[in-house]
Design a protein with these regions (language model features):
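Short, well-ordered, mixed-charge alpha-helical segments that flank or form enzyme active sites
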Residues: 109, 151-155
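Beta1-alpha1 glycine-rich phosphate/pyrophosphate-binding loop at the start
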Residues: 1-70, 145-146, 155-171
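Glycine-/small-residue-rich active-site loops that bind phosphorylated ligands and cofactors
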Residues: 12, 78, 152
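Alpha-helix N-cap/helix-start capping motif
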Residues: 10-11, 125, 150
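FAD-binding core/adjacent interface of flavoenzyme oxidoreductases
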Residues: 1, 68-145
Length: 171
């Protein structure tokens, strides 16, 4: 059996799965998908969770099901490329023949002093929930600074204007 190990249930690995599982997948291939959550998240919508305009249940997408696909919930602790295995946070080791690493990205603070220490993230559902809770607790008239004016920053500012018109928002 050949083992394909996919790390991360983000857009990249979902695309790989859809392409492989919608074709005649050779019987000698087993696919294992590892992610910290048992669903795919529409990451481009995390700003709406942070702003409180959409519940996180609306941006969860069920993972595909297939007899040759196994899902493992966990966090990657270590990758041993030489021995061809991935160790998860709980100590479980997963062997592979082919590995795809699609674990997402990290926040970019654009060299803004203090941003790394004093900001909240919307990179994960958990981060977005925490950001929402913090924003919810702000008194009216508070100023919210958004570091980064890319798509997510603009979307967050727009949604915050809708959900919290009492806040001052700066990009």
């Amino acid at each position: 059996m050949r083992k394909l190990l996919l790390l991360g249930a983000g857009y990249g690995n979902m695309r790989i799965l859809l392409r492989l599982l919608n074709k005649d997948l050779p019987e000698d291939i087993d696919i294992t998908l590892v992610d910290r959550t048992p669903f795919h998240s529409l990451k481009t919508e995390f700003y709406a969770i942070a702003a409180g305009t959409v519940p996180d249940s609306e941006i969860r997408v069920a993972l595909p099901e297939h007899p040759q696909l196994t899902f493992v919930e966990g966090e990657v602790f270590r990758i041993d490329a030489e021995q061809q295995f991935v160790e998860l946070g709980d100590g479980k080791k997963l062997q592979y023949d082919e590995l795809v690493i699609g674990l997402g990205c990290e926040d970019n603070y654009h060299d803004v002093p203090g941003a790394a220490e004093h900001t909240y993230s919307i990179q994960t559902i958990g981060d977005s929930r925490q950001t929402y809770q913090t924003l919810l607790g702000l008194p009216g008239g508070s100023t919210v600074g958004i570091v980064g004016a890319g798509l997510s920053g603009i979307e967050l500012a727009s949604e915050l204007r809708e959900s919290r018109p009492d806040l001052k928002i700066k990009l």
